[in-house]
C-alpha cells in the first residue's frame, strides 16, 4: 500500500463504521424504546436507517476494497449485483428522506388533517412504494443487460468493475432518484421555514396587542374609579399613601385564527390600609405575565414580568426559535445537497461524455454520496432529545457506562436570560447556601448538646 491508500483506508473505515453502528443504533432505539415505537412517523426513520445500513454493508464495504486495492476481486457476477444494490439502496435512502420531508410538512402545516389521515397503515404503504420504486430503478440494469462489466486494465492487467449506463437511463434514473426528490425537499422545507417564521411573528403580534389592550383596560377602569369617587364626593388617596389596597384581577385570553379576546375584571376593595402605586402596578404586571406564561411557556419561561418587546433581551429571545429553524433546515438540506448533487451531476455527464472525468474524480463524488448514509443518523436522530435518551439507555445497558446529556435549549436560553432572572438565580443560590450553613450549625449544636449530656451522665 502506498502513502495515499492509508489515509483512504482510515477515511473509508470511519464512514463505514459511522453508517453501520449509527443506523443500527437508530433501529435498536425505535424497537426497544416504547415512546419512540408508539410514534408512527418513526417508521420513516426505520426505513431510512435500513436503507443506509444496506448501503454500508452491501455497497460501501466492497467499494472500499475495490478503491484501496485498485482492482475488483469479486468476479463478474457480483459486479452486476453490486451496481444494482448501489442504485437500489442509495435511491431508497434519498426517497426516504423525501418521504420524511413530506411527513414533517403535513404534520406541521396541517396537524388536524395529519392526525386524521396519517396512521401506521398509510405510512407502511408509502414505505413499500419507496422500496418498489427503488428496486425497479436498481433492477433495470440487470433486466436489460447493461450497467456493469468487468474489464481488464491494460496497464495493470487486473480486473476492473466498470459502471456503464446508457444516457437515457442515466438521465431518467437521476431524475427519479435525486433531482425530483431534491426539488420536493427544497420546496417543502422552504415552506416550512416560512410557515414557522409567520407563526412566530403572529404570536408576537398577538402578545403585543393583548398586552396593550390590557393596559388600556386597566387605565379606563382607573378613570371610571376616579370619576365615580369624584361624583360621590369621596376622597382620593395619593399614590404614595401608606394605605393598602387589594386588587383581584383575572385575565382570560382566548386565541382564534382571526381574533383575540381579552377580558379584564378589576375589583378594588378599600380598607384601612392601602398599598403603594408601585406595588399595585407590579402585582398587575405579575398577574398578566402569569397568564402569558401559561399561554406561551417557551417564550416567557424564564421571565418574571412582561418586558418591552423592543428591548434587546426580548428581541434575542424571540429570535432563538428562528435561528434554530434556520440551523436545522440548513444542516438537513446542506448535507443532502453537498453529498449527492456532485455525484448525480457527474453521473449524467459521464454517460454523455465517458472520458471527461478521471477515476479519482469519480471515486471522490461516489464516496461523497456514500457519506450521506453516515450523516443521516446524526442529523435525524442524535439531535432529537427522545433519541438521545434512548441511545443513552442502550449504551448503558450494553457497555455499562453513561454520560451527562447536554441541554442545548437550556444553554441557548441562558445566554439571553434577563438580568433580573440571573440575580434571582444568584439570590436563590445564596439562600440555599445560607440555609445549608444554618442546617450545619444546627446539627453542630445538637451534637454539642448530646455530647454535653453524655458527659454529664458519665460517673466520675
Swiss-Prot record:
TM spans (from-to): 11-31, 43-63, 68-88, 126-146, 169-189, 329-349, 362-382
Pfam families: 7tm_1 (PF00001)
Gene3D superfamilies, per database record: Rhodopsin 7-helix transmembrane proteins
Entry GO CC: dendrite; plasma membrane; synapse
PROSITE patterns the UniProt entry points to: G_PROTEIN_RECEP_F1_1, G_PROTEIN_RECEP_F1_2
Low complexity: bias regions: 250-268
Recorded GO MF terms: dopamine neurotransmitter receptor activity, coupled via Gs; epinephrine binding; G protein-coupled serotonin receptor activity; neurotransmitter receptor activity; norepinephrine binding
UniProt keywords, alphabetically: Cell membrane, Disulfide bond, G-protein coupled receptor, Glycoprotein, Membrane, Receptor, Transducer, Transmembrane, Transmembrane helix
Region of interest: Disordered: 235-281, 427-460
Cysteine disulfide links: 79-161
Topology in membrane: Multi-pass membrane protein
Protein role: G-protein coupled receptor which binds to the neurotransmitter dopamine with high affinity. Promotes the secretion of FMRFamide-like neuropeptide flp-11 in the RIS neurons which inhibits late-stage swimming frequency. Plays a role in modulating mechanosensory behavior in response to non-localized mechanical stimulation. Under mitochondrial stress, plays a role in bacterial preference, resulting in learned avoidance behavior.
Protein name: Dopamine receptor 1
Source organism of the structure: Caenorhabditis elegans
